[in-house]
């Protein structure tokens, strides 16, 4: 937890006052056995009722002061722990937002959710208990021993011998349990991930009648977590009985020695009661300490896992504003000297990309250029690298080799904000958030007017969808847009990107749920936009990209062909195969046309 202590810096006062008031509570608690001994040895022995009443009110005062100190300590501990957890959770969330897709792919969504919720809650609980009890228990144990020595040196030696044995037991159990708590949290990650996967894909599971297999797999993982939890629980449970045995042995020895001293006249009965009370206080606090150590072990394991997230550094760096301005001036001068650079919106120069730990590149030696205002279609088989290519344009990933240019400048020279403002992305999976349609559309541009929103909806063929909803723009969407159909969600996500009025618009197979008529109307509307936009259309439908100015054909990560529809039908086997698989009636016509062309050439 040491590396996370920085998030306590705004709660230094609370972190000091909480144990301080616990210390005051300990002082008041340690006075109580002495007062009780005085009541027995003086008040009762001398039949002095006045003395007994006086000491009784002192006991009441000590109890009241102890209670007030305890409540105050709890207040400061709660304030510090809750504030710490809030800042830590925000810091982790902010850190995750700045990680590149490479790190997010490596960490996994389920791991991040567990660490942002369960792990941070464990750390918060550990800090709260630590501030209240971590010092209180040692204070009581050591204080009881000191007070015992003030009563009788020989009897107090029992305390001095028992305490080291108790701490040895605590240390041994802690030594073995800490690594196991880390394993428990790891198993919890696995169960969380499996739960999320199965609940997300529950319709697919039922469609393939895989319920039994899904339940069996979950049961296996859950049993692994349960068995490990039981083992750790049994190990931790040893703490209390072993502590009790040692304390009870010490108590028997204490009473035996104290009884002998009373018979010899070296001690009074009240002092024996005081010694026993101090021993009882030690028992209670050592039990609390045992529970505290278990909690702190869990917190330490969780703190380490949270710290691991904060240690992950993004492999993607963005330039500072000053560096960016200087680079822009330099690149503008270069672009002015070379007119071709200023005409191109996007240029790929021998780009190769490989996902982390993939073992093979997903894109290899890709080169092409796109002029401003052009529409580019990207087509290819499953796994050919279509989404990967457009992700490089958005700089969700950095190219492993080669360069990607935006407006004649290396895309890595743009600041994050400037790059995002230029590019509008509609991903494959339509993602909407809980809130009104208006709130979701304004993700594109916060200052957009309702007129801008309706204009974007009209272009995205989503106007009728919104007009048919109660409240229209104020219609509330459920999480991930569950109260909309797939096609409706896609149209809203396209509209959200259009609200931004980006220079580069990327539609990553984002019209797959639209019928052919709506898809055609969408493409027609995109061609009539009132600003100059370069559009990238990723699609499985060759009909969706036939009218594109440039079509890129990908095959297993390589650029199999590029050109217009007519050019690719003549020159690219991969494109012909895709096209004719979707329009088989065209194959015969193409064959007859090709044969006629060959005969004509032979005749000539």
PLM segments and residue spans:
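Membrane-integrated ABC transporters
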Residues: 1-29, 36, 44-59, 65, ...
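Transmembrane helices of ABC transporter permease
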Residues: 10, 14-27, 58, 62, ...
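An intracellular "coupling" helix at the cytosolic face of ABC transporter transmembrane type-1 domains
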Residues: 10-13, 98-102, 118-131, 135, ...
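Juxtamembrane helix-loop junctions of ABC transporter transmembrane domains
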Residues: 20-21, 25-41, 53, 62-109, ...
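Short intracellular "coupling" helices and adjacent cytoplasmic loop segments at the cytosolic face
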Residues: 46-47, 82, 90-114, 118-120, ...
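ABC-type nucleotide-binding domain
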Residues: 326-604
């Amino acid at each position: 937890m040491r590396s996370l202590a920085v998030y306590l810096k705004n709660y230094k006062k609370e972190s000091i006052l909480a144990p301080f008031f616990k210390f005051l509570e300990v002082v008041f608690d340690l006075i109580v056995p002495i007062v009780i001994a005085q009541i027995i040895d003086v008040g009762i022995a001398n039949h002095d009722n006045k003395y007994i009443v006086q000491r009784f009110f002192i006991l009441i005062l000590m109890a009241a002061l102890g209670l007030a100190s305890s409540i105050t300590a709890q207040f400061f501990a709660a304030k510090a722990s809750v504030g710490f957890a809030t800042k830590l959770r925000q810091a982790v969330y902010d850190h995750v937002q700045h990680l590149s897709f490479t790190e997010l792919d490596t960490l996994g969504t389920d791991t991040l959710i567990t660490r942002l919720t369960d792990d941070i809650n464990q750390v918060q609980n550990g800090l709260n208990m630590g501030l209240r009890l971590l010092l209180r228990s040692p204070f009581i144990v050591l204080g009881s021993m000191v007070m015992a020595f003030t009563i009788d040196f020989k009897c107090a030696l029992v305390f001095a011998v028992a305490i080291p044995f108790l701490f040895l037991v605590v240390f041994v159990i802690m030594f073995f349990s800490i690594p196991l708590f880390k394993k428990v949290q790891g198993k919890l990650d696995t169960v969380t991930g499996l739960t999320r996967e199965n609940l997300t894909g529950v319709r697919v599971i039922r469609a393939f009648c895989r319920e039994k297999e899904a339940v069996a797999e979950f049961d296996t993982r859950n049993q692994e977590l349960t068995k490990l939890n039981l083992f750790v629980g049994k190990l931790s449970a040893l703490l209390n009985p072993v502590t009790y045995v040692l304390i009870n042995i010490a108590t028997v020895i204490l009473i035996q020695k104290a009884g002998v001293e009373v018979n010899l006249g070296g001690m009074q009965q009240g002092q024996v009661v005081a010694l026993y009370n101090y021993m009882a206080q030690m028992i209670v606090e050592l039990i609390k300490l045992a529970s505290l150590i278990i909690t702190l072990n869990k917190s330490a394991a969780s703190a380490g896992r949270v710290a691991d997230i904060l240690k992950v550094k993004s492999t993607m760096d963005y330039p500072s504003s000053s560096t960016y301005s200087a680079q822009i001036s330099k690149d503008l001068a270069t672009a002015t000297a070379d007119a071709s650079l200023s005409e191109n919106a996007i240029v790929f120069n021998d780009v190769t990309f490989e996902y982390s730990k993939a073992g093979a590149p997903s894109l290899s030696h890709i080169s092409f250029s796109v002029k401003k205002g052009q529409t580019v279609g990207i087509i290819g088989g499953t796994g050919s690298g279509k989404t990967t290519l457009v992700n490089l344009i958005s700089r969700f990933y950095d190219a492993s080799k080669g360069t990607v240019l935006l407006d004649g400048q290396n895309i890595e020279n743009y600041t994050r904000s400037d790059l995002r403002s230029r590019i509008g992305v509609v991903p494959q999976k339509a993602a909407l958030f809980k809130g009104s349609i208006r709130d979701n559309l304004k993700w594109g541009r916060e200052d957009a007017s309702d007129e801008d929103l309706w204009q974007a909806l009209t272009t995205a063929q989503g106007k009728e969808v919104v007009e048919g909803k109660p409240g229209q723009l104020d219609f509330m969407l459920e999480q991930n847009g569950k109260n909309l159909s797939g096609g409706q969600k896609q149209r809203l996500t396209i509209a959200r990107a259009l609200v931004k009025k980006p220079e580069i618009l990327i539609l990553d197979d984002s019209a797959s749920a639209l019928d052919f008529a709506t898809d055609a109307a969408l493409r027609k509307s995109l061609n009539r936009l009132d600003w100059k936009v370069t559009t990238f259309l990723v699609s499985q439908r060759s009909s969706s990209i036939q009218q594109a100015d440039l079509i890129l054909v990908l095959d297993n990560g390589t650029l199999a062909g590029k050109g217009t529809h007519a050019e690719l039908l003549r020159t690219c086997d991969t494109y012909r195969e895709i096209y004719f698989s979707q329009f088989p009636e065209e194959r015969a016509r193409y064959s007859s046309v090709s044969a006629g062309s060959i005969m004509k050439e032979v005749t000539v």
